[in-house]
Amino acid sequence: MPSATRKNAPKGKCPICGAPTKAEFRPFCSRGCRDRDLLNWLGDAYRLPVKDLQAEDGDFD
């Protein structure tokens, strides 16, 4: 089966608003959604889970 080319590659949806993405702002649809995503990261709206190693080992004192 041939791999998808740019011409017939499936279009994605913007993770912020759900609109079709644009190549210039991919994976977003616009500069506004791209900037909103950045502000979410900078404002701690997004968080990565962190495992507390000190609670497990107790050897960090």
From Swiss-Prot:
Pfam families reported for this sequence: YacG
Cofactor note (record): Binds 1 zinc ion.
Keywords: Metal-binding, Zinc
Keyword Plastid: no
Coiled coil stretches, renumbered: none
Molecular functions (GO terms): DNA topoisomerase type II (double strand cut, ATP-hydrolyzing) inhibitor activity; zinc ion binding
GO BP annotations listed: regulation of DNA-templated transcription
Alphabetized InterPro entries for the sequence: DNA_gyrase_inhibitor_YacG, Znf_NHR/GATA
Similarity field: Belongs to the DNA gyrase inhibitor YacG family.
Function noted in UniProt: Inhibits all the catalytic activities of DNA gyrase by preventing its interaction with DNA. Acts by binding directly to the C-terminal domain of GyrB, which probably disrupts DNA binding by the gyrase.
Subunit and partners: Interacts with GyrB.
The protein's name: DNA gyrase inhibitor YacG
Organism: Zymomonas mobilis subsp. mobilis (strain ATCC 31821 / ZM4 / CP4)
